[in-house]
């Protein structure tokens, strides 16, 4: 027997200050009544054959976003329900020079998520950026 009394997932953004609004930054996200949680491993600019990109930061950001979208959609989840996005990069300065690509993607897909950006010494092979997400439904 199945219970047909489904509750709708609720997502609440917590922003106690105003400064983060101009940066597409969210201080916290509260989620209630979830049906499932998807923990997405770090997605990078690796092609369908498993080859790591040696392209510039801008190109790798675009490819990493495409791969992240593919995993999320293949899992039956929606981009707008990303609640956490961690960004790892080997160069914060290069990442922030191209950060508008990520901000525009977030706005276009109505994503409001908690985030952390970390500069790391290295990523796999020739990769310079990695996107790790948590998605709910």
What are these regions (language model features)?
Residues 1-66, 70-83, 89-137:
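N-terminal presequence-like segments and the immediate start of the first folded domain
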